UniProtKB/Swiss-Prot annotation:
It comes from Neosartorya fischeri (strain ATCC 1020 / DSM 3700 / CBS 544.65 / FGSC A1164 / JCM 1740 / NRRL 181 / WB 181). Binds 1 zinc ion per subunit. GO terms for molecular function: methylthioribulose 1-phosphate dehydratase activity; zinc ion binding. Zn(2+) binds at H117, H119, H202. This is Methylthioribulose-1-phosphate dehydratase. Its main location: cytoplasm. One of its GO terms (biological process) is L-methionine salvage from methylthioadenosine. The active site is at E146 (proton donor/acceptor). Its EC number is 4.2.1.109. Substrate binds at C100. Residues 1-20 are annotated as: Disordered. Pathway: Amino-acid biosynthesis; L-methionine biosynthesis via salvage pathway; L-methionine from S-methyl-5-thio-alpha-D-ribose 1-phosphate: step 2/6.
């Protein structure tokens, strides 16, 4: 497989005039996220599953400059570990695969169609506030805010309501991105209805059934995190 990829890099997988094709959507999303301050300094990542293919933004490339020909493509399903067993069917030879890959795969194994990883400052700040106010094992909670309606209750359960309490688990950061995978899987098991996991002092992983849902859920969460930080400054409780 490695020799085949080297000789025939399957460029047709990322060549499409369709703006909704993953190879076109990922660069567009990364530019938006960069402009919103979510993926500065090459940080963060985005991945989309379409059928039995997974499209992933590369590592170490400025997110606002990513082009379709920079995109990696994996067969799905594919092993998470070891990295050498992952079934790449398109691998730009001059670039490195995303360190987020096993975490994206974890979301796709649970039925996600898109997974987004950001380094949002608001996400980082709420992880620190939760740790200081409630301890290292607590999750982020907020209620009685209209934007909560933008977050699902769980698979097939509709959306949260104004009076519901949104809960987002928080895991501890690690020295290497891939080492977060076990903690992410554990958080998903403990909170089976969640569509996001915060990483303390790092950022957040958000996934959805498709690209639009993952993006809008990520936007709603970032709004709520920013609001929570401002509420904390004013001494206002997050849960009423």
């Amino acid at each position: 497989m490695a020799q085949e990829v080297e000789n025939n890099n399957n460029d047709h997988l990322v060549q499409s005039s369709d703006p909704e094709h993953p190879a076109n959507l990922i660069p567009e999303l990364c530019r938006k996220f960069y402009n919103w301050g979510w993926v500065t300094g090459t940080g963060g990542g985005t991945s989309i599953r379409r059928g039995d293919h997974i499209f992933i933004a590369p590592s170490g490339v400025q997110k606002e400059l990513i082009q379709p020909h920079n995109i990696f493509v994996l067969e799905f399903p594919t092993p998470k570990y070891p990295p050498s067993d992952r079934k790449y069917i398109r691998k730009p030879l001059e670039l490195k695969p995303s360190a987020c890959t096993p975490l994206f795969l974890t979301a796709f194994e649970r039925g996600a169609g898109c997974c987004i990883h950001t380094h949002s400052q608001w996400a980082v700040l709420v992880t620190l506030l939760v740790e200081r106010e409630k301890g290292p094992d607590a999750c982020f909670e907020i209620s009685n805010i209209e934007q909560i309606k933008g977050i699902p209750r769980g698979k097939g359960k509709g959306m949260l309501g104004f009076f519901d309490t949104l809960k987002i688990p928080i895991i501890e950061n690690t020295a290497f991105e891939e080492d977060l995978t076990g903690s992410l899987e554990k958080a998903m098991d403990q909170y089976p209805d969640t569509y996001a996991v915060l990483v303390r002092r790092h950022g957040i992983y958000v996934w959805g059934d498709d690209v639009a849902k993952a993006k809008t859920q990520c936007e709603s969460l970032d709004y709520l995190f920013q609001l929570a930080v401002e509420m904390h400054k004013l001494g206002l409780p997050w849960v009423k």
